[in-house]
Amino acid sequence: MTVRTRIAPSPTGDPHVGTAYVALFNLCFARQHGGQFILRIEDTDQARSTAESEQDILTALRWLGLNWDEGPDVGGPHGPYRQSERKHMYGQYAEDLVTAGHAFYCFRTPEELDAIREERKAQGLNPGIKGDLELPEEEVKRRLDAGDPYVIRMKVPDEGVCEIQDMLRGTIEIDWAQVDCQILLKSDGMPTYHLANVVDDHLMGITHVLRGEEWINSAPKHKLLYQYFGWDMPELCHLPLLRNPDKSKLSKRKNPTSINFYERMGFLPEAVTNYLGRMGWSMPDEREKFTLDEMIENFDIQRVSLGGPVFDVEKLRWLNGQWIREELSDEQFMARMQQWWFNQDDLKALVPHIKGRAEVFSDVAPMAQFMFSGMLNLKPEDFAHNKLDESQVKRVLQFALWKLEAQRHWSKNTIFADIKALAKAMDLKMGDFMFSIFVAIAGTPNSWSVMDSMALLGPDMTRSRLRHALEVMGGFSKKETKKVEKEYAALGV
């Protein structure tokens, strides 16, 4: 048997370090066993999926050295490798399950489903969708003939226990009563993740599925689908989730999570990959610094620890420093620095904003310095403003951060629209509102267009600087945060 693993990201945002972490372990497992590593794009969420996000994911993973054998950009014998391009095949599989009695047409309205949830909740049951969902055969035929909208749901046992075999955790038991009748095919004909995932893994010959532990509760549905189809199920391995230093689930609200951020900060890809390799796994000799090839050579999935691995940016900085000092000659250091500092695409985007302000080349460094920095050296007094008190400044920074965290289409125009709407909702003049934003992003209120700066810096660096500025100003306590969250919600922006 040829071992085949896969990573299947959704192109709905910035390339996440969690995606890279899971991709790395899948790659190492496949290579260790002389197998193949596949990349598949799971873009069934057409409303949120973008081509730009897909390209960002591919570029980021390649930057880290995580190369795949088959995928949407390199092709392969099991293509296409985008689920949106495989849409035509999922419907028949769902219909086959209906014919076999393993799934059913569901015509329930959202209101009816809400009522079912409330009834189950009142009975102390799991509020997932189960119970009185199926209609008599004659009624189903009448509804289908009338063209009523429907979804296809899988049938799930009402009682008993589902046993899942996990490569790290052994036998996992989940009560069937906790598993809902999952939608397999949506009313628009698109499959849900669960159907597409199982069908694609089977058709692509995936033998081992290494994924995050957040998918454990979905494993019974997947096991049931494999049984319904009469297919062999891949071996499962649920990896521990990455954590913030405070042990909470890794999130962009507390840590930069985009791979793009670390590239922009000037981290070495080898160091980032090395650090991700230490997330819950260790070399047999416990050394901290190792190459991807060394990790592959020594990889043993049983060395993965189930304790939540902590993604600590300061620890990553330390490791990156070790790589710089121990692995790069002066010439290599200079070449890498030039590659990062004089990135042609970045410079091309930056020049129009500084050329008109410069009289001699030595003017450029002070004007552009903040574009090539990490977190700026800020002090609370930098935010002193004659019209805004400290409380207002902190709210400007926090509200801007929350608003921009929700922005999926990052550009000067979308940023401006968000900022303008916030300033209006807070009843602040644009100039007064922007003062704190200028200082947070550029380190001074006297800089060239901060909207352009944020567009060029990108979402993760922009958010990180706003978060850093808020910390410099003292931030909010947990109690204050709840109050401020209510204020933000009341703005309606």
Swiss-Prot record:
ATP binds at residue 252. This is Glutamate--tRNA ligase. Monomer. It is found in: Cytoplasm. One of its GO terms (molecular function) is tRNA binding. Keywords: Aminoacyl-tRNA synthetase, ATP-binding, Cytoplasm, Ligase, Nucleotide-binding, Protein biosynthesis. It is an enzyme of class 6 (ligase). One of its GO terms (cellular component) is cytosol. Transmembrane segments: none annotated. It catalyses: tRNA(Glu) + L-glutamate + ATP = L-glutamyl-tRNA(Glu) + AMP + diphosphate.
